[in-house]
């Protein structure tokens, strides 16, 4: 495992921990899209179906368990424990418009037409667009708490670092996975406008994050 992948995994873990701490400490999930969190949970479930059948390393298994537990923990906090604080009115993105096309694409374009491989491919496609309900919610409300902006920035950084990981692996191992690379680029592009606003408004101006009108 190279430095880019490890740093990406750290950024991803930080994003998840920041989100969980934000919800738990504030006793509120205001500003967080429950629909995006459901999609992320679905991503991890379909990606890690091999958890109990294939063992690659302790690190790999530990990270799989962490992602599964954390994602379901987030869903529980949002949809059960603190559901009274969940802003359903602004979290209205139709997630079936993401799930169904991702599944169709996974059935059509995959490495091998077997169940585990199709599910893995589905998770890659779905993860690329799973943040859209959150960004849609952010565009509707017009602003977000600084801690929520930090969460989104860490999440976007994780995917960007994975792109660097793939570039590194291409030049050092001649490894190239077009499905992962294209999906990763799409996911990073979705964050582009958010990154710009985050850097100019939250980092440089130290203000609450606000979307442009």
Curated annotation (Swiss-Prot):
GO CC terms of this entry: cis-Golgi network; endoplasmic reticulum; endoplasmic reticulum membrane
Cytoplasmic side: 22-35, 81-96, 138-149, 200-213
Subcellular location(s) per record: Endoplasmic reticulum membrane
Major location (coarse): endoplasmic reticulum
Listed PROSITE patterns: ER_LUMEN_RECEPTOR_1, ER_LUMEN_RECEPTOR_2
Membrane-related topology note: Multi-pass membrane protein
Entry-linked Pfam families: ER_lumen_recept (PF00810)
Membrane spanning stretches: 3-21, 36-53, 62-80, 97-110, 118-137, 150-168, 179-199
Lineage top rank: taxon: Eukaryota
GO molecular function terms noted in the UniProt entry: ER retention sequence binding
Entry keyword annotation includes Metal-binding: no
Keywords for the protein's UniProt record, in alphabetical order: Endoplasmic reticulum, ER-Golgi transport, Membrane, Protein transport, Receptor, Transmembrane, Transmembrane helix, Transport
Family: Belongs to the ERD2 family.
Protein purpose: Required for the retention of luminal endoplasmic reticulum proteins. Determines the specificity of the luminal ER protein retention system. Also required for normal vesicular traffic through the Golgi.
Protein name: ER lumen protein-retaining receptor erd-2.1
Organism of provenance: Caenorhabditis elegans
Lineage, opening ranks: Eukaryota, Metazoa, Ecdysozoa, Nematoda, Chromadorea
């Amino acid at each position: 495992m190279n430095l880019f992948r490890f740093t990406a995994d750290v950024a991803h873990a930080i994003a998840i921990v920041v989100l969980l701490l934000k919800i738990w400490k504030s006793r509120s999930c205001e500003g967080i899209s429950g629909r995006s969190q459901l999609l992320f949970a679905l991503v991890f479930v379909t990606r890690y179906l091999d958890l109990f059948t294939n063992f690659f390393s302790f690190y790999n298994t530990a990270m799989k368990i962490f992602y599964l537990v954390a994602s379901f923990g987030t869903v529980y906090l949002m949809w059960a424990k603190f559901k009274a604080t969940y802003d359903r009115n602004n979290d209205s993105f139709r997630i079936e418009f993401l799930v169904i096309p991702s599944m169709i694409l996974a059935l059509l374009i995959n490495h091998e037409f077997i169940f585990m491989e199709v599910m893995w491919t589905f998770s890659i496609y779905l993860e690329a667009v799973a943040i859209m309900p959150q960004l849609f919610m952010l565009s509707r409300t017009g602003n977000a708490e600084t801690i929520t902006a930090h969460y989104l920035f860490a999440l976007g950084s994780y995917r960007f670092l994975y792109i660097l990981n793939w570039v590194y692996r291409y030049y050092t191992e001649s490894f190239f996975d077009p499905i992962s690379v294209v999906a990763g680029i799409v996911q990073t592009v979705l964050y582009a406008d958010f990154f710009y606003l985050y850097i100019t408004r939250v980092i440089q101006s130290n203000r609450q994050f606000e979307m442009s009108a």
